[in-house]
């Protein structure tokens, strides 16, 4: 069942989010790391989020598994998350995102474990260990054997989750399935997701992911419009905001590779922006004091000449700037430029939610001129309030919008 938490401390008290086994325990020794769900919730509250609804889909599996086990278990792990058989009319069938049918107050949807589910087997990496520096002093003669240097490398010897070509398609299809549910049933909700890290040698057609990730996403069918050719499972939609790259932050040391996905951070920024400034306002340019690095490190020019600049037209990109790390773009993944600005999509979501609530209050009233006029006034007052805040153009409310509710 969904669990409501209003603070990080509340979540921390309820969930063993930092007890994920790195591998199957051997004897009494057990190495642990944080779960990606816990990391996303932590970043959400650290960046301004005020309230989260947690839907638990099962226990975390060991980060390091036997060869081939991740691919073999992928469909099994995706099933309770995507809830293909869940019916909006049957609460008993609700699991995973199926619970959205009973949570109309939700505005942002995150799937923090999705990349990890679709990733290939993680690798162990070598970590450079430097001997501690010490002042030069005379010591008693000893053998020439170098003293062993011990240093806690934390989780830096674990590579972060990366996807191969098959995993990337699985991630795209799963995210597209969630997007399709929002477009069909929950049009006022927004899906916030981190792009997965590709393998170092990942390429699609003639494009290497490491060289031009924007072109790679286009060739892989991620940034194309949903249609019959891809089964409606592409993610280029006004219902989706993608975030990139993966981040090294002040609290990511308990994750493999000391890197966290950026979706929790982006969701927190969107949440506090809605409360403090208005959901329709852009969060581009927000400084990110907790961020100290990224994978990969993006070059940024701001004049649309680098692959990172092109990527920022469709993806919320975090990169260094002369004043520190900032969120450089606030965009949806939509292929339609009219729906590209993130604030436009969020504004429409707010209007749809208000219209739904107005309709719910009048659901069992007699349809007629009196009811139509009341609904017109309700929506007119709402749109006027948005216009006064600058969400709508026009010199007057009459220029900015019109509302009509009648027999037609």
Language model features with spans:
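Structured, hydrophobic secondary-structure cores that serve as assembly/anchoring elements
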Residues: 1-62, 101-116, 159-408
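Long, structured protein-protein interaction/assembly regions in large complexes
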Residues: 61-185
